[in-house]
């Protein structure tokens, strides 16, 4: 417990907030190149094969990014746009690939939540 004199001399130091997406350098999105595309199993109560990509961003950071939706066309050397946003049951995956931009195609025939998956508007009859 500091004395009043110590507080007058030094004051209180503000706690710094930690940046969860430091690799993005305060940018909303960053472009990167896929180094490897693979699957990973989630944490305990869940069971699946989640698709992830190891991406080297334009600022030379290597990250793991989740590929959302069913099916994808990503390969090694594909160029993707990455946004922040973690995957709760995959430790160490703190980014999402954006569908429908650069080399990662949107999901065809998707009707709901189209904007999140880069899907075209369905033709009305």
Swiss-Prot record:
Keywords per UniProt: Mitochondrion, Ribonucleoprotein, Ribosomal protein
Record's compositionally biased regions (Basic and acidic residues): 10-23
Positions of the UniProt region annotated as Disordered: 1-27
Domain of life: Eukaryota
Gene Ontology MF: a single term: structural constituent of ribosome
GO CC, one annotated term: mitochondrion
PROSITE patterns: RIBOSOMAL_S12
GO biological processes: translation
InterPro entries noted in UniProt: NA-bd_OB-fold, Ribosomal_uS12, Ribosomal_uS12_bac
Main location: mitochondrion
Subcellular location: Mitochondrion
Main function: Protein S12 is involved in the translation initiation step.
Family affiliation: Belongs to the universal ribosomal protein uS12 family.
Protein name in the entry: Small ribosomal subunit protein uS12m
Species whose genome carries this gene: Zea mays (Maize)
